[in-house]
Structures are given as C-alpha cells and as structure tokens.
Amino acid sequence: MSLVPQRSAPPPPSSSANRAASSLAFQPASTSNSASPTSSSTSTFANGSSSSTTAYRPQPTINTSVSALQGPRSGLPAQTGLAFSVSSLSNNPPAASPITAPSSALPWSSQNPAASGSTATFPPRPVRSNTAGPDTLHTISSVSASQTVAPVMVQRSHSSIAAHQASPSLNQSSPTLDADGPASLTTQSHFVHPSRDRERSRDGTTTPGSRNTFKSVFGGFVNSMSDVFSAQKKIEISTPYDPVHLTHVGFNSDTGEFTGLPKEWQQLLQESGISRQDQEANPQAVIDIVAFYQDATQSQGGSDVWKKMGAAKGNKAPATPRTDTSSEDGIYRVAPQPVLYEKPRTAPAPPGITHPNRPSEFGSPDLRQPPSNASTSSADTALRPSRSTPAPGAAPPPNAKTTSSSNPPPCKPSPASRAPDAPAAVSAASKNAKGPGSVPRRRETKKSTIKDSEVIAKLQAICTDADPTKLYRSLQKIGQGASGGVFTAYQVGTNVSVAIKQMNLEQQPKKDLIINEILVMKESRHRNIVNFIDSFLFKGDLWVVMEYMEGGSLTDVVTCNIMTEGQIAAVSREVLEGLRHLHQHGVIHRDIKSDNVLLSLQGDIKLTDFGFCAQIGESQAKRTTMVGTPYWMAPEVVTRKEYGPKVDIWSLGIMCIEMVEGEPPYLNENPLRALYLIATNGTPKINNPENLSNTFKDFLTTSLDVDAERRPDALGMLAHPFLKRSESLRTLTPLIKAAREQTRKS
C-alpha cells in the first residue's frame, strides 16, 4: 500500500435523488480538531473491478472512536459490514452509533487498515441483485460547511474480487478549496481494475465517471507518448571556460611598431618586401596576412597552397625570376618532381634579362605535352616576349610563323639540350635559401588524421572492382608526379582515347582530397566540366579515368598567344556555365585559374581539378578555410573572412587579366607581399587599360569587386553585355595548334 499525492478535480454536483438513493455511510478513522481539506483515497485490486465513492463536505471537527473502525462492534451484527453515521457534528461529537439497515445494503464494510493498524478483511462477494446498476455514476453531494450531511456512497458495477486480497495501492489526493467557504473534505475509496488506470488524466488524477472507452484509452496513450517525448530535452552545450590567449598581436600607433609579434613574423615581414610605411598604413592588413600565412603553413592543406606560390625570394627585386616548386597532387594534376615534366611559362621581363619561366601545372590530367616529348620537356630559360595588349577585334596570330617580325616569338620553349640549366637554377635557389635572408622554414605538414583503412574502404565503395589493364590498352606516359603518373590510353572495344591518372595511395599525403574529387566528378555531369569515366583500385594504386582533352590547358594558350576580347568572352562564358552548374549543386571550386581550364582541339572548354572544391549546405553557407592558389584568391579569403561561391567569380576576373597579360597580378612579388597587395589594393590594375573596350573593363570591374555582397554570382555574370561579344569556340583552334606546335619544337 502506497500513498501517492495527487491533485483531484472538484467534485461534480449531485442531485438530491442521488443523495437519497445512498444514505448509508461510515465515519473515517482520521481525527482532526479542524475542518479537513478535500481528500481522496483509491484502492485498486489486481483481480476484479469495483468502485465505491464516499464523499464528505466541509464540516466542523469530527472526533470518532478508533474502536468504531475495528472488528465487529456492539450493536452491529457480526460480519455485516454495515456502515455507521455520525449522530451530530460538533466540537465534541458523541460516539458513533450504528444504523439499522438491511445486511444487503452494502457488500462489505469500508475499513481503514492504515488507521487501525490491523489487516483489512473483506466479506464474501455480494450477490448481483444487491449491487448497483451498471449505469450508476459516482455522485458527490455538494453542500455548505455549516450543513449536516452524511457521506454519500454510490456503487458501480462489480466484478469478481478476491475476498481477502489487500489493495495494491492507495492514492491520497491533494486538498482543494471551496470558493464559498472553508476547505472541504472529500474522501474517495475507489476500487478499480488495473485497466482503469488509463482513465487517469495527464496530471495523474482520477476522473470519476469516465468510461473505459476508445476515446479515453486513446487519450491516455497520446498523453503518455507526449510525456515521453517532452522528457527528451535537447542537450545543452556550454560556452568555453577558462580560455587562455597566448599570443596577441597589436599595433602601437605612437611608435609605429607591432606589439606581441613573434620574432619569426618580424623576420618574415622584413624579408617580404612590406616596408615600414606599408605596415603603418595598413596594420590590420599586415596582421591578417601574417595570420593567414601562419594558418597556411600549419594547416593540413597549406603545403600545396604555398608550393603553388613558389619558394620565397626574400628581398629580391620584382624582376627576380620566380622559382616555382609546385607539386599539387590533385586527382588529375601531376605533381612535378623538380622541374622536369613542367610546361614553361614565364612572366614579362625587361629585354635582355633571362629567367626561368613560371611552369604551369599538370591539369586534369596535363595533356598539353605530346607523348613523344613528355619525358624531355624542361624549364625554359628563354626570354618571355614582351606583349602589348591587343586592340579590340585584333586577330591573333594563327601560329608562330605569322607573328610580326617586330616582336619576338610568342612562345619559345626550351629544347631538350637546355635541360641541365633547370637543375642549376634549382641549385642556386637552394643555396640562396640557406642564407640569412631566407624565410623561416615551414613547419612540416601534419599527417592526415584519416586512417588508411578508412580510405581503402571508401575507395572500394566508389571504385569499380575490375582489372583496368584489361579494359584499357596502349598506355603511354605523358607525365610523372610525386604520387603517380599520367597516361593516355584507348578503351578496349570502343577505341576511345582517355586519360588515366595513377596514384600510389601510400605516397599520397591528402587522401581525403582524392575521395572528394572523385565524388564531385561523378556527381557533376556537365558539358563544361571534364567528364569522369571510371575509377579502379588496382594493386594498391588508384586509377582515375577521365576524358582526354587533347588541346591542353588554357595556360598554354595565354602564354603563347594574344587573345582577342571575343575569344576572352567565349572562354569566360563557358567557365561561367560550368560554375553555375557547380554552384547550383552546392559546390565551390575554389581554384579557378587557367591551369584548371582544359581545351579540346575543337575549342571545347571544361573545368577540372576538383581537389580543393568544397561542398556547402544550408547549415554551412559560408566557409573560412584557406584553400586555392593565392594569386587568384579573393580578398575575403586572404583576410580570413567568411566566403561563398562568389570567390570563384573573383578568380574568373583574375583569369581574364591572365588572358590579357599572360599572367595574374603580383606574380613577381614576394608571396607574402602579394597577399598584402591583394588585401589592400582591392581591384588590381591592368596595364594599358586604354586598349580595352569599356564593356570589357566593366566586366573586369564587376567580377573583381572587393565587396563580395555587390559582386554578382555566376548567373548574374552570364547576363553581362560583354559576353554577347563572344566569338565561336572554333576560333580558339588556331591558338591551340600554335601552342602544340611550339611544344613539339621543344
């Protein structure tokens, strides 16, 4: 037996007929010196179902003898179970006297074992004729506190009950107050079957008179389910506590010096070509780009970014040759080992000064070099011809032979006999790097946290389980990287030419980028995106098969030819179409540049190299990670702000300058100073802008807007009037052939 406090609803009013029908009651065992509040007690039996209700109204202090509730009493027949009533209600009431009534008036006596301390006993089951009808409802009379009334008891239908089984539970309700008088006392002895527990309301009280119908059962189920789900509260995550700020870099405007700047950063600024005046003019930009540099050198993917920028050159003159040690290992880009297998690409320089070219990187894959010359190509030490910006509508030279005699050849790759010069240049750069003026050594790249077993499992899930050597024939190597080689091959049965990139997974530092690129390529089917064909995991090597773009990359075209505005517009339109498709599917490319735009001999233009692309969703509409090639980076990326797909629009604008001038802005600057100029100069300036049409200049200004909010998206840029001047893509064919011809001569 348990006492569970519950809140009971106010008793419903009862008619006088109901009160007359139930005139037999008994006095409870509890004694009190004052009026007691309303209370209810319920006893539930496991076997059987019956209920009886005894109601009390506000009344003076009731004092009854405890012996009246114990065993057979004088004046009452033994084991009759007849109730007794209180003869008067006063401060000193007389002892309870029995009420003469037929023995069939009540089926048993209501005793309070808890009050008497004895075990409750019950009479045999009453006959059916002496029980109340099935339609009899609980009735509780409503009277004032000053009236004298006997408790009212109404019987509900009874079923089988164990004669001497104790009640498994006793619920004591909480008191209620009557609006018109003192507290009322209502006690219920409610014997119910366990199934009637469904009739309880949500707050735990019993609703007398409610029927065990489908509605009540369903309501109880809904209430119980709502209680279950409401109990599952959302986990609260606390804010960080006890944070420790170890390094804080500030700027003292009085002294014009930075405070708290580590020595390595101070040396880096001194060697980067950022003057003291620059630091005083834009202290916040300096702090941003130094922090950017630090993040890049310590992050997992930072090594590729800075390798793309080339080795730092200290405080060298702007015309100092840029030694590129690019070794980006995208899926379809070969990471060159030293300088071999790199395409020559030089920056403009004054006449008479020779320097190594800016080598372009292998695309997706680098199919710019014919197979016969792939293993003999080397860095070019020849002079990069000075070029003037073409006037609008000027036709480009179809090949090297038609170039004006007043200008040097547009592109002169070095022959194979000049190959030893490249190692010499690399050796010289290595010696210079050991000097006191070199940039501090970069921290070693941390190993990827992803386990090899996880990579293998993911690759096996997305790769075809077959032997690629039986599906492709005549593999011919056209390039070699740190992690594998690039081959051309023919598909067995169809004789279709394909490009295959082989990668040794053990030598691949960023395996997660491999998986990312394969997934993006498989899901991005578009005429302006390089078509992914298949992938294989064969003998520990990953084979990625894609369509063969025999025209090479756009880098070959811009370094060896002068493009017209119509051709630039055509290339920009095709790139924007590919970007629109990616952005609509929640993908940011993040590395748009001429090296990642491949061409076919018919002039088809397709994007490649999705190793740095990012998937964005509703919960991550902006990103802050630093990836891409810094010379093509938007200011919001350099300054480590949140960015979105519009960073690709900025990179497209830089690529347009690349198509005009042959190289991106700040290419010959120290890498750190280049970042400083991107962050502070805003829209880069173009040489000889008077040679460009107003429409083209507006296109550049719009795409290179420093404010990312004002910068249009890919769809908005496609509506620009400049793209209406696009020429046919077939006009690019002569430029592609000219670049390939120069490559063969090398």
Curated annotation (Swiss-Prot):
Function of this protein? Answer: MAP4K component of the MAPK pathway required for the mating pheromone response and the regulation of cell polarity and cell cycle. Phosphorylates histone H2B to form H2BS10ph.
Q: Which UniProt keywords apply?
A: ATP-binding, Cytoplasm, Kinase, Nucleotide-binding, Nucleus, Pheromone response, Serine/threonine-protein kinase, Transferase
**All residue ranges annotated as the Protein kinase domain in the record:** 472-723
Disulfide pairings: none
| Residues binding ATP, per UniProt | 478-486, 501
Which residue range or ranges hold the CRIB domain? 237-250
The protein depicted here goes by the name Serine/threonine-protein kinase SMU1
What is the protein's species of origin?
Answer: Mycosarcoma maydis
Question: What residue spans carry the Low complexity bias annotation?
Answer: 15-54, 85-105, 414-430
| Catalytic residues in the record | 591 (proton acceptor)
What Gene Ontology cellular-component terms does the record carry? cytoplasm; nucleus
Basic and acidic residues biased stretches? 194-203
What the record says about family reads: Belongs to the protein kinase superfamily. STE Ser/Thr protein kinase family. STE20 subfamily.
Tell me, what's a Pfam family for it? PBD
* Chief subcellular location: cytoplasm
